[in-house]
Amino acid sequence: TGVQTCALPILAARKIHDSETKKHLIECAKAEFMEKGFARASLRNICQEAGDTTGALYFFFHDKDDLFCEIVGDFMDRLNAIIKEHYSHEVKEADRGYENEHDDSLDFECTKKLVHEIYQHRDEVLMVLTKSQGSTMENVMDRLVDQMDEHNAFICKAMCKANDVHMVDKKVVHWMSHSQVDMFIFMVTHIDNEKEALAFAEKGMEYLIAGWYAIVK
């Protein structure tokens, strides 16, 4: 029992050391990816900057892609959660046959959440947008457009039915899905601070919503 008691603080210290090592590797990797992009980034350089061996890196991460995804993955999960929560509200409205008018305030509330999340993790966003070529995150924006397109097609069909309007051409819906994503991409790549970004995004949403209503009513 004495040996077991002594082992506990040793294990705790090792966990703390491992946690600090992993955190430092991630910090150095983020700097390397931001400077060189995924394809040109070197695991050897990352380890040298971190003062660790490649063995230490492979203890925590399977490969370079796993390391890249570790840096941006949590943010992408939170972003997706915000979007899916918004989708659920819109699906409920559609399922009720739009017995009441669509609540535009939900669109602006979602926009505010997205802008805040994006600017809390702007480096990670820019990594995905501009530094991810060659990684499994390379086409994540295309996948987001596809996800949005599927949802928008469902909502558009429901709105057209409720308003007795002929269904909008799917290519137009697809273009509108691109426009929604492109608005946020333009925002994060051209605007440096959250306050200005939110003002831009709110105007952008007014424009997108007006265009949406113009073809479904």
What is the predicted role of each segment?
Residues T1-L8:
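Short, small-residue-biased leader/transition segments that mark boundaries at the very start
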Residues I71-D107:
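Amphipathic alpha-helical linker/stalk segments
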Residues H89-Y98, K112-S135, F186:
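Amphipathic alpha-helical segments used for helix-helix packing
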Residues K30, V128-V145, A199-W212:
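C-terminal/domain-terminus segments
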Residues H24, C28, E32-D66, E70:
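Helix-turn-helix
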Residues S105, E109-D123, Q133-C160, K171-H178:
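Amphipathic alpha-helical packing segments from all-alpha helical-bundle domains
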Residues H116, Q120, E150-K157, K170-K217:
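C-terminal peripheral helix-coil segments that are non-catalytic and often amphipathic
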